[in-house]
């Protein structure tokens, strides 16, 4: 059998299997949306105004323990980054910055988990649907060649059924794109607040060093 004949026999399967594939992908898409929605909601919201003021006040007074308590009472990725930075107070700004950057990288991975699935479905589901439509049209003309008495009605019926695949592909893609953009916006805003907290801690802890017992104290004036 020639390669063309093999391909033709495959295309004559029609578009129904493509529809089932799109339905399966839509289930995956909805599952990702629900999982990401619950994850981002459960991560909590960091009260930047209130907790930020407490952090600045404690750190300017050299009270790192108080700053840690303020952060421990909060939720969200911002508090995780702040806690990582406060654990390194007294070891220099480089150690503080590296600890917060490492924590931010881990948080980014958690926030963006599975979002690539939504992006991929949003970009490719219409093409999968279009592929199903092409297969359906090929089958419609093949049916016409075997049933010439049916005329245009046979072709139109097959084409209309084939176009369903394109419609289903769009139905899968549009919600996926909307959800992807929504979650990406949430991630960007969260990471922006994380950066704001990190910069605040770096600036507030620049003059803090450790005493012999490991407690953090403000650096004395005059460099003594």
Regions found by a protein language model. Give the residues of each.
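Short, conserved clusters of charged catalytic residues that mark active-site
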Residues: 3, 16, 50, 113-116, ...
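Predominantly long cytosolic amphipathic alpha-helical stalk/bundle segments
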Residues: 38, 43-151, 178-224
């Amino acid at each position: 059998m020639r390669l063309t004949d093999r391909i033709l026999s495959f295309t004559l399967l029609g578009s129904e299997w493509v529809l089932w594939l799109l339905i399966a992908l839509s289930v995956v898409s909805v599952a990702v949306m629900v999982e990401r929605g619950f994850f981002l909601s459960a991560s909590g919201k960091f009260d930047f105004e209130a907790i930020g003021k407490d952090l600045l006040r404690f750190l300017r007074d050299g009270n790192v323990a108080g700053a840690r308590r303020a952060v421990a009472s909060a939720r969200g990725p911002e508090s995780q980054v702040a806690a990582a930075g406060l654990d390194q107070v007294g070891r220099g700004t480089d150690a503080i910055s590296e600890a917060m950057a490492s924590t931010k990288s881990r948080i980014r991975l958690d926030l963006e988990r599975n979002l690539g699935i939504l992006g991929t479905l949003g970009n490719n589901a219409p093409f999968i649907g279009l592929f199903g439509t092409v297969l359906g049209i090929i089958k419609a003309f093949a049916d016409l060649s075997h049933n010439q008495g049916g005329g245009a009605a046979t072709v139109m019926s097959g084409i209309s059924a084939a176009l369903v695949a394109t419609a289903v592909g769009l139905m899968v893609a549009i919600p996926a794109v909307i959800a992807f953009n929504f979650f990406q916006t949430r991630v960007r805003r969260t990471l922006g607040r994380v950066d704001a907290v990190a910069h605040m801690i770096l600036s507030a802890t620049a003059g803090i060093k450790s005493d012999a017992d490991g407690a953090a104290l403000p650096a004395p004036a005059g460099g003594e």
